[in-house]
């Protein structure tokens, strides 16, 4: 876990190092004075206008009345370093999430309720990594929106924020469902369930995806290609353009809505159900049946710790970005002559927050690898193609979705049957 934390600290420091000294690239009236595409996301930046734009026109010298007195800019090194970070997240996210899905799919005894929710979370992250990250890399290197002068660019402009918001919604709702599932598992501690995904879990997963897509519809509606003029040339960029009263309302409350639903809700849900789970465990410390099932309860507690770790990582990855948005919404005043220092701080926090938030799409498999030794063995066996010969038998321990362990053929049938029975525990 220490290695994992050090890696996160390294990337944060790296991003902070390449930030330039130009705070005013965050204009509240325009996405950026020259380059609309230097940020690591569409919705996850200050590129969204606070007022409804029509056709934007910049002065030929690229300056505006609201700019800070000092000239500022983003260093060119940022593009390439941020591209390396994006490519790393792309590779790790694609390999990690795909491997996680393969592990759960190929091992029949791993197909249980908690694992199904983890697979749903991994699939949502995989979709974002495969589709959205390449667009980010193109924007960073090309300095413009892809296909910005044809209909396919308009399609990407709507698809990009839609998938981005859907992916976050899938993550948030799956974490809530995992917290509820862990409470149910502890509350019904005497129930031993067989192999398979419960019907209620399947319904939850389908509902999570449908709700996530529905909540992301305003993003697809609001984001359009907005034309603007700069130095006598016509350009287009993808940004939020409120054209109706509902979209104007959505744009006004968007930061608070994202902070409340997509950040606070999973934390509150986890706090509530983990508190109930702790009370349940303390109230049932005694009893002969509980003693007999102590191993199963221990395994369930281990899964609860794993889920809690995923929630904590989610909070750490997304908190800086939400904090910068709330501060920008409540504290920053574009008419304040002393705003430049605050804007520099918000800009730094925003860059760090954007990269951390994007990193969350690849970090869950890594977290499972370090938190669970059994999951670590499973990843190693899958990635390194270490298959045991006829002298080894693969079985899965508790159906809590955390492990795979290996048993020798030399074990007697009695022990094998006991191991198979333990595999059915969720």
From Swiss-Prot:
Gene responsible for this protein: EDNRA
Extracellular side: 21-79, 132-158, 229-255, 328-346
GO molecular function: endothelin receptor activity
Subunit relationships: Interacts with HDAC7 and KAT5.
Source taxon at top rank: Eukaryota
Cytoplasmic side: 102-111, 181-204, 278-305, 372-426
Keyword terms of this UniProt record: Cell membrane, Disulfide bond, G-protein coupled receptor, Glycoprotein, Membrane, Phosphoprotein, Receptor, Signal, Transducer, Transmembrane, Transmembrane helix
Broad class of the protein's primary localization: membrane
Residues that bear Phosphoserine: 424
Signal sequence bounds: 1-20
Bilayer topology annotation: Multi-pass membrane protein
Glycosites: 29, 61, 241
Disulfide pattern: 157-238
Record-stated family: Belongs to the G-protein coupled receptor 1 family. Endothelin receptor subfamily. EDNRA sub-subfamily.
Role, per record: Receptor for endothelin-1. Mediates its action by association with G proteins that activate a phosphatidylinositol-calcium second messenger system. The rank order of binding affinities for ET-A is: ET1 > ET2 >> ET3.
Transmembrane segments: 80-101, 112-131, 159-180, 205-228, 256-277, 306-327, 347-371
One GO BP: developmental pigmentation
Compartments where found: Cell membrane
Protein name (record): Endothelin-1 receptor
Organism expressing this protein natively: Canis lupus familiaris
Coiled coil segments of this chain: none
GO cellular component, one term: plasma membrane
